[in-house]
Amino acid sequence: MKKDLISNHIQLDDSGKLIHLLGLEGLSKQYLIHILDTADSLIDVSGNLKKSKALDDIFVANLFFEPSTRTRNTFEIAAMRSSANVINVDLANSALKKNEDLLNTMRTLKAMQIDMFVIRHKQNGLPHHVVQHLKDVSILNAGDGINAHPTQALLDMLSIRQHKKTFENLSVAIVGDITHSRVAHSDIQALKTLGTTDIRLIAPKVLQYNLAPCSVVKHFDDIEPGLKNCDVVIVLRLQKERMIEADIPNEQEYFDNFGLTPKRLALAKPDAIVMHPGPTNRGVEIDSNVADGNQSIILQQVTNGIAVRMAVMQILVNKS
């Protein structure tokens, strides 16, 4: 899918209402805050998730063409907590194995009165392609190639907002395989939209993200100056499955140079928070003492992922 064809304008209707969630580019600061506020309203004062009847009589189909534990399960739980009916399509035994076209499979499922599809696929822009050919059903992007992962970015923003007063004055470091990370790409977009003016991308040069010149984004190929006095550290794993073999770093060498250790974390502000979208590879991109430490909010991110996905689903069907 050509990058210039991956446009998010098709996720809004003529009145500006969100009818699909394909990516965060093109959504206003006010709309992102609306999603975060809706997610917050689904968490009680004790930090527990509420249940809702908002998706009663709605049928949601999960189509995950890439391996997933956290994302698929949190989407399923989010739908169930909103009283939706959920099916996880068994792709290994579906008609796709008989060379049926994906769109034909989805049209067949839609004929079974599916209201919403949650799609994860290795191809950049696949959810956008589906939206252009499948009408009167909501499409929710659960990650497409290295392009975007909008709900992960939203849950990251919710997690940050729960610990920091404002986005505008934050210094946020993103450490790891930025080139192949759809999470990084969506996090950068969300942070820029919410007003963050100091975003630091820390990675070996071969794993950096070739952004257009931007005053709020700085690149570092040395972790220590990149972490200095930052408020938030988002750690990413090495996505070996998306790399050519020649670019895959030696794990021990990578940890020695870019792993987040307690000593390196001490360079950040004392109240800095540590985040990771999972799965974590301890001893590669993050030390266990950091992942399990007092500054880590990794498990809180998982809970917030359910709240955010509940919120998005409810907004898409206009029942938030």
Curated annotation (Swiss-Prot):
Record's keyword terms, sorted: Pyrimidine biosynthesis, Transferase
Amino acids binding L-aspartate: K98, R182, R237
Pfam families: OTCace (PF00185), OTCace_N (PF02729)
Swiss-Prot/TrEMBL catalytic activity: carbamoyl phosphate + L-aspartate = N-carbamoyl-L-aspartate + phosphate + H(+)
Any one of the GO CC terms: cytosol
Xref: InterPro entries: Asp/Orn_carbamoyltranf_P-bd (IPR006132), Asp/Orn_carbamoylTrfase (IPR006130), Asp/Orn_carbamoylTrfase_sf (IPR036901), Asp_carbamoyltransf (IPR002082), Asp_carbamoyltransf_Asp/Orn-bd (IPR006131)
EC code(s) of this entry: 2.1.3.2
Pathway: Pyrimidine metabolism; UMP biosynthesis via de novo pathway; (S)-dihydroorotate from bicarbonate: step 2/3
Gene3D superfamilies the record matches: Aspartate/ornithine carbamoyltransferase
Cross-referenced SUPFAM superfamilies: Aspartate/ornithine carbamoyltransferase
Listed HAMAP family: Asp_carb_tr
Its biological purpose: Catalyzes the condensation of carbamoyl phosphate and aspartate to form carbamoyl aspartate and inorganic phosphate, the committed step in the de novo pyrimidine nucleotide biosynthesis pathway.
Designated name of the protein: Aspartate carbamoyltransferase catalytic subunit
Organism, as annotated: Ruthia magnifica subsp. Calyptogena magnifica
Upper classification of the organism: Bacteria, Pseudomonadati, Pseudomonadota, Gammaproteobacteria, Candidatus Pseudothioglobaceae
